[in-house]
Amino acid sequence: MSAILPTPFPYRLTLGPALLLTLLLATIQPAGAQGPNFTLPGLDDQPVRLADFRGRWVVVNFWATWCAPCLLEMPELQTFHEAHGARAAVIGINFENLAPAEIRSFAKRLAITFPVVLSGGHPIPGFELKGLPTTFLVSPAGELVDTHLGTVNAAMLTARLDELEKTAGSLR
């Protein structure tokens, strides 16, 4: 083998840093760049756009009817929605390929009044799922600022929102 490659592969040292730089540049968004966005069908067949909620915090929660932890947090999301409607919106994204009527009936049984949209079980660019439930927090400017895998409750969401608003206020 030494006759074919008498010296170590010459690009080995430069490939690593170049690849790292390429990956870092790919993840950097220019100043003023918008975060993730989606337009998905709601339970009433009307499109729901994340961009329509700009100016408020948005709690984006991915869930499924078969997910026990998801069902445990639904009343908490509803409580948060009722308490913080002017300050923050909640959008539930059902991550299953079920008929809208099934999800509509399910949401009605749970007394959910926040918007529920249907992903058809397809991933949504900008929202990386590693399991269910997963909750994302989107800033009033439309930037993804937090991700939580596992259940959340109204107190957790309120505390996180207070913390982010306090931090944002101190930066001004």
Describe every region a protein language model picked out:
Residues 88-100, 112-121:
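Thiol-based oxidoreductase modules, predominantly thioredoxin-like and allied folds used
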Residues 62-79:
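Conserved redox-active cysteine motifs that mediate thiol-disulfide chemistry
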Residues 25-50:
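N-terminal "domain-start" segment that seeds a small globular fold
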Residues 104-141:
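Short, internal strand/loop/helix patches
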Residues 1-11:
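N-terminal secretory signal peptides that target proteins for export/translocation
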Residues 137-172:
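Thiol-/selenol-based redox modules, centered on thioredoxin-like
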